[in-house]
Curated annotation (Swiss-Prot):
Acts as a regulatory subunit of the 26 proteasome which is involved in the ATP-dependent degradation of ubiquitinated proteins. Acts redundantly with RPN5A. Disruption phenotype: No visible phenotype. SUPFAM superfamilies: Winged helix' DNA-binding domain (SSF46785). The keyword Protein transport does not apply. The keyword Chaperone does not apply. This is 26S proteasome non-ATPase regulatory subunit 12 homolog B. Ubiquitous with highest expression in flowers. GO terms for cellular component: cytoplasm; nucleus; proteasome complex. Belongs to the proteasome subunit p55 family. It is found in: Cytoplasm; Nucleus. It comes from the Eukaryota. It comes from Arabidopsis thaliana.
Length: 442
């Protein structure tokens, strides 16, 4: 009782002092009095009184911004020293209420929200944690450090992926420009001029830009895996592979390079896939995993690949991927790999044949005629090649795929020939007309 009375009298004395300083607009004095009140409540372990005093002081008429900021920052130091989760949540919510709508404590509010979301996640309330995080738009915070902003947005993306909200995860991920990870951190930062906003330094627990780069691409791999976007997964692994810390450690770059090779094999044939495939084959480190170099060479070489022999050779490596960094290649990966080999073989056949029977095509692809027709039709629809099927005679006619320049040149040449022909015809008509006119006069 004696201690309680003593605490009340000390707080009353400090409240009077705080009022005098506040009315006199004495920033240092107001800040000191307010923080001293919070300190007394904390030392007495009276958490309820602490919450009350934080709210009361923040609502005082004409309360100075600096005093509110100091109170919030000081009270945040007490969060980890609370006795139980309920008390911790209550204190965080109190500080969040004080910080709401105040631009000068927006960074503190973001950090408090992150703490609360972490507690909710530990309690198994992932949806609630995700909703809390999405309430804060850190990309608009000018004073927040770049790395802290990125870390916050990545946490938002991760929580969305954890609750299978892939649409929102994509929207949030677009707030981060991948080029930001390639910024030169060795350059000296310009000192801000007087009057400019000072950017706060990121807390010690925020990872470096290169660590954030890896986290970002690992999250993007999770997102792209949902729709089996193999070429985008491959590009994400390529970005991880280019991180210096990964390239220097064989235990890290070998599994990543293996993943790049597998996803190149799984990706549909297009200019992006061809470019990445050739760039990977030029990598000297690929020779340290010869089986995968052979796999990529087989895909690049315009020769028919026997699926059975390829699968027997790489089946163990394929299934072993689930024990590597990044986990398995996906549920449909085995089927998609077979499909890519069939597509590769059809492209090879279209290069060497202008006409071929269905029966012969099916033999080369080791498929039935119905399956061969189905895969060929899908490739024609996707414009991977040009072919015409004569079903009654069972013959396929392949045509060379022309690029836009060739088509334009061909059209211009044909138009020139047509105009020449029209001009010659005009000359002939004119000549005949002149001859007949002379004959009539005679």
């Amino acid at each position: 009782m004696e201690e309680s009375r003593q605490l009340e009298s000390s707080i009353d004395r400090l409240l009077n002092e705080e009022k005098q300083m506040r009315l006199a607009e004495n920033v240092a004095g107001t800040r000191k009095a307010a923080t001293e009140i919070l300190k007394l409540c904390f030392e007495a372990k009276d958490w309820k009184l602490l919450n009350e005093q934080i709210l009361n002081l923040s609502k005082k008429r004409g309360q100075l911004k600096q005093a509110v900021q100091s109170m919030v920052q000081q009270a945040m130091q007490y969060i980890d020293q609370t006795l139980d989760i309920e008390t911790r949540i209550e204190l965080i919510k109190t500080l969040n209420n004080v910080a709401a709508g105040k631009i000068y404590v927006e960074i503190e509010r973001a950090r408090l929200t992150k703490m609360l979301a972490k507690i909710k996640e530990e309690q198994g309330l992932i949806a609630e944690a995700a909703d809390l995080m999405q309430e804060v738009a850190v990309e608009t915070f000018g004073a927040m450090a770049k790395t802290e902003k990125i870390a916050f947005i990545l946490e938002q993306v991760r929580l969305c992926l954890d609750q299978k909200d892939f649409v929102r995860a994509q929207i949030l991920s677009r707030k981060i420009n991948p080029r930001v990870f390639d910024a030169d951190t060795t350059k000296e930062k310009k000192k801000p001029k007087e009057g400019e906003n000072m950017v706060e330094e990121a807390p010690a627990d925020i990872p470096t830009l290169l660590v954030l780069k890896r986290i970002y691409y690992e999250l993007m791999i999770r997102y792209y895996s949902h729709n089996n976007e193999y070429i985008e997964i491959c590009r994400s692994y390529k970005a991880i592979y280019d991180i210096p810390s990964v390239k220097e450690n064989p235990e890290q770059w070998i599994p990543v390079l293996r993943k790049i090779c597998w996803f190149l094999a799984l990706a549909p044939h297009d200019p992006m896939q061809s470019s990445l495939l050739n760039a990977t084959l030029e990598d000297k480190k690929l020779s340290e995993i010869p089986d995968f170099k052979m796999l990529l060479k087989q895909i690049v070489t315009m020769e028919v690949i026997q699926w059975t022999s390829l699968w027997n050779k790489y089946k163990d490596e394929f299934e072993n991927e689930k024990n590597m960094i990044g986990g398995s290649l996906g549920d449909k990966a085995g089927e998609d790999l077979k499909l890519r080999i069939i597509e590769h073989n059809i492209l090879v056949v279209s290069k060497y044949y202008s006409r071929i029977t269905f029966k012969r095509l099916a033999e080369l692809l080791c498929l039935t005629t119905e399956e061969a027709e189905k895969h060929l039709s899908e490739m024609v629809v996707s414009k991977a090649l040009i072919a015409k099927i004569d079903r009654p005679s069972g013959i396929i006619c392949f045509q060379i795929v022309k690029d836009s320049n060739e088509i334009l040149n061909s059209w211009a040449t044909n138009l020139e020939k047509l105009l020449d022909l029209v001009e010659k015809s005009c000359h002939q008509i004119h000549k005949e007309t002149m001859v007949h006119k002379v004959a009539l006069r005679a």
